[in-house]
Regions:
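Beta-alpha-beta core module
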Residues: 1-6, 20-21, 66-114
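Flexible hinge/capping segments at coil-to-helix
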Residues: 1-7, 11-33
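Generic preference for hydrophobic
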Residues: 9-10, 33, 58, 96, ...
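Thr-Gly-centered strand-to-loop micro-motif
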Residues: 12, 35-36, 81-82
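Secondary-structure junction motif
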Residues: 17-18, 25, 31-54, 117-126, ...
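Conserved glycosyltransferase catalytic-site signature
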Residues: 42, 64-65
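A local structural motif
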Residues: 50-59, 93-94
């Protein structure tokens, strides 16, 4: 998809790190971290952390960020996660801080080649394909 998502840290609003606008690699060693299984499988962070990667204190992994957010809310640690998955606005006790330098990932959608879709799913996919085609056309240089 023609968009990216941003990695960062989910934490309690009363955490000392919450006062910072961004989180740097040197901020994380020694902190109890919750990492997504996606993070571990793809090893998204080893390059970002550099030599400090081995010093990370990953106390558990999660499949669903919602479950990790409950642990973060209870003060068990800090979740390495993508932005805008868990509500952090309003009266939420949680906040998200992006990593610095920025770590972005592309978003993808996949389906089986000969999949039978419901009418709603079929219309959604058609609309998505039109939007992506329009984005690509707008993003490509004008042909002379």
């Amino acid at each position: 998809l023609p968009v990216t998502d941003i990695w960062g840290v989910l934490m309690r609003k009363d955490s000392p790190l919450a006062a910072r606008p961004t989180i740097r690699p040197q901020d994380l060693p020694g902190l109890p971290l919750l990492a997504s299984n996606q993070y571990l499988v793809k090893n998204e962070f080893s390059g970002w952390f550099g030599e400090g990667y081995e010093k990370l204190n990953i106390i558990t992994t999660y499949n669903l960020l919602y479950n990790a957010s409950i642990m973060v809310e209870e003060g068990m640690g800090y979740a390495l996660c993508l932005d805008k998955i868990v509500r952090t606005s309003g009266d939420s006790p949680l906040c998200f801080r992006p990593l610095e330098p920025k770590l972005e990932v592309g978003l993808h959608i996949a389906w089986k080649k000969y999949q039978f879709f419901s009418k709603a799913a079929e219309k959604f996919l058609e609309c998505l394909q039109r939007e992506i085609a329009a984005w690509r056309k707008a993003d490509s240089p004008a042909q002379e």
